[in-house]
């Protein structure tokens, strides 16, 4: 995370009821989350089966789902990168220019899932979201639209240009989230046209 979770908690008085983390990778944020919330109130979602099994081994008992999430159910090709963290349903755009050492080494076919079909399996009030799925964040959010009016906080990777082909740009995310009263209050950019942003429910500002 480019923006410190602990700094966000202090600055915005974040209260965690439940966390949905999409793009688990190896659950690197788990220790930070556990300062505020227990594992039974966290749901992780990860597209790579090998990473899901690794997380289950490292952190027995966590809630984790193996799923490729999007805004509609369809068959897709999921691209796997040599660094793991750049894997995506989207093709590289400017990513290849800024990170020439990273490339896709294999791919597999899979069927996408809507988050709204996963979330009811768990007794969690998901008020804090963390999305890091390489340009597909808006697609995933649209797949759980029914839940967004009860979300208080969203931490997400964002793009100012097409780091991945046809990825959502930050202005599109801003416009979409505004209709759910989620307002961007923090942004931290890298030099490679991508970064992290933090959105908060408007009525929680200045509380």
Residue ranges and their predicted role:
Residues 1-207:
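Phosphate/nucleotide-binding beta-alpha loop and adjacent structural elements of enzyme active sites
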């Amino acid at each position: 995370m480019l923006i410190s979770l602990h700094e966000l908690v202090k600055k915005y008085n974040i209260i965690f009821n439940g966390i949905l983390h999409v793009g688990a990778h190896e659950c690197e944020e788990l220790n930070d989350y556990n300062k505020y919330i227990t594992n039974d109130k966290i749901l992780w979602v990860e597209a790579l089966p090998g990473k899901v099994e690794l997380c289950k081994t490292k952190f027995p008992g966590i809630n984790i789902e193996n799923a490729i999430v999007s805004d509609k159910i369809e068959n897709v090709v999921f691209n796997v990168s040599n660094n793991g963290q750049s894997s995506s349903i989207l093709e590289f755009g400017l990513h290849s220019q800024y990170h020439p050492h990273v490339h896709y080494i294999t791919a597999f076919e899979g069927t996408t899932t809507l988050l709204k079909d996963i979330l009811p399996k768990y007794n969690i009030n998901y008020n804090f979201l963390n999305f890091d799925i390489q340009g597909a964040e808006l697609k995933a959010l649209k797949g759980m639209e029914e839940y967004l009016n009860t979300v208080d906080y969203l931490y997400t990777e964002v793009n100012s240009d097409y780091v991945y082909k046809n990825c959502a740009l930050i202005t599109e995310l801003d416009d979409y989230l505004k209709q759910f009263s989620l307002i961007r209050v923090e942004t931290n950019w890298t030099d490679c046209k991508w970064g992290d942003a933090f959105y908060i429910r408007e009525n929680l500002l200045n509380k």
